[in-house]
Amino acid sequence: MPESTAPALSLEQAARGGGMMRRLVLRELALLDQGRLRLFLPEGGHIAFGSPAAGGPGAMIQVKDENAFRRIVLSADIGLTEGYIEGEWDSPDLAAVIGFFLENIERTPNVSGSGRKALALGALRIADRIGHLLRSNDRATARRNIAEHYDLSNDFFRLFLDPSMMYSSARWNGHTATLEEAQREKNEALCRHLRLGPSDHLLEIGTGWGGFALHAVSTRGCRVTSLTISPAQRDLAVERIRAAGLSDRIEVRLEDFRDHRGSYDKCVSIEMMEALGHRYLPAFCSAVGRLLKPNGLAAFQYITCPDARYEQFRKGVDFIQKHIFPGSLLLSVNRVNALMTEKGGFQLHALDDFGPDYARTLDAWAQAFEANLAGVRALGFDERFIRKWRLYLRYCEAAFAHRNIGVVQALYTRPNNPALNPPCSPAA
């Protein structure tokens, strides 16, 4: 990274050293007045943006290639992230960089979640939007979307997840010192919401690698039928269930929830609903209503965007949707509640919001990822992949830390439900 002795430049001086693309980007950056960002230029020198009163070093970007400015002009925030992936800029603290732009989201044009538009930036975002729409989650496309992320390699995910292989936010409290303990607490919280007991048959929509099913059966003695459309996840989940001696209590089915038939006491889904997109969330809520018994309970953990910004998120596309989770969309709590009522007669009974816990979870994953880069390379992943995943983890960490997005556990019930008794205790 640049030396602290690099001379400070005025906006005019910094613009003079580059072409039109640089000038356009610097002009937009000059409008951002929250936090602090120092931009170091390829020819030397730096320019500061944000508030002079902001404490600490703030965020820092070292531009290595003038093409970084061109990407930003053409693709706005997606161009910024793609420039990092291609090595055109670097930073010692990616979360701080993303955090700077989130602090200024109302003044940052043409980004997901922002209502501000600027004709000078984002000329190619329409192409990104069309590409995103083409990844809508019908049955065939849903399998392809899931495979692109979750079927990368089970060994890859082992490198940075804890032993439970939970790839969702943990819940941290005064009793959770490690990521594994915090993931156990997340699972416990869902079990408590569901009042799970030995007589329950639980439907899980989205198996992951079997971590929640293993926890639920080993602590509550229930039965679990778990649905997944990822062959790689299914294979490892079945292997882990067999090793735990619980194959008689847990069935993992390679099946789309829309095709499943059955009748269940309880339903759980952990960070799967975001993958559905706007169009297919109603089908999920209808399926839950169809598959749950009249006195059934449903507990979901899902990632949220602010209700007031949902339409902006829905009509946009960001780095995560283009490069990490194609076809996905963060959820509005209000919309989920309305659809659960409309499609299944449910009402929201309890809601826990723990967004900062996800920032801490992502930081733990990012640290483990960096500590195991040799293992990532040994699996055949190149430096571009490493930079993309490094950015993904820190990008999401910043979004949760700045409360731009959140994560909730929500319990849904139908009215007059006697199943809402005190939470069950873990099995002895």
Which residues does each PLM region occupy?
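Substrate-binding/catalytic lobe of Class I Rossmann-like enzymes that use SAM or dcSAM, i.e.
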Residues: 303-420, 426-428
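A short glycine-rich, Lys/Arg-flanked "PGG" loop and its adjoining helix->strand segment in the class I
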Residues: 282-294
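A short acidic, Gly/Pro-enriched loop at the edge of an enzyme's catalytic core
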Residues: 258-267
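Feature captures hydrophobic
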Residues: 1-183, 189
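Conserved SAM-binding loop of SAM-dependent methyltransferases across substrates and taxa
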Residues: 209-220
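Conserved SAM-binding motif I beta-strand of class I
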Residues: 223-228
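Conserved class I S-adenosyl-L-methionine
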Residues: 198-206
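Conserved beta-strand signature within the Rossmann-like core of class I S-adenosyl-L-methionine
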Residues: 295-303
